[in-house]
Amino acid sequence: MVHLTADETALVTGLWAKVNVKEYGGEALGRLLVVYPWTQRFFEHFGDLSSASAVMHNPKVKAHGEKVLASFGDGLKHLDDLKGAFAELSALHCEKSHVDPQNFKLLGNMLVCVLSRHLGKEFSPQAQAAYEKVVAGVANALAHKYH
């Protein structure tokens, strides 16, 4: 559960309506793989990840990033029950993929960077604070099955 004020909820949902899920998702995942290269081990089957350019232009990275961000967007509809909304993904990442749950926080950080880059002045400090709460809540929900 994420505790947002009415103003924070309005900021999050209002800005989300402007998000290009395909573009931002690929960029967020690509940044994760470049900035934290040890995360690439989960995506070795994506092909060439040998350089920042290769990662950022890799169609499989872009497609998976879009899928990840679409799931994040679906989660925004369930801010009062993020653990329930992400239960299946939490189990998948824990039991099958064995992803370090810390990586969910790192991806959230990358998403905040991407939102700031694309939304510019609209991504105010207040909007960032609200999104920081949301990405922390999503990361916590995704890590739920690890406990």
UniProtKB/Swiss-Prot annotation:
Matches recorded under SUPFAM superfamilies: Globin-like (SSF46458)
Cystine pairings recorded for this chain: none
Record-linked InterPro entries: Globin (IPR000971), Globin-like_sf (IPR009050), Globin/Proto (IPR012292), Hemoglobin_b (IPR002337), Hemoglobin_oxygen_transport (IPR050056)
Coiled-coil ranges (or none): none
A single MF term (Gene Ontology): organic acid binding
GO biological processes: hydrogen peroxide catabolic process
Keyword Zinc-finger attributed: no
Family matches, as Pfam families: Globin
Any single Gene Ontology cellular-component annotation: haptoglobin-hemoglobin complex
Subunit note: Heterotetramer of two delta chains and two alpha chains.
Protein name: Hemoglobin subunit delta
Organism: Dugong dugon
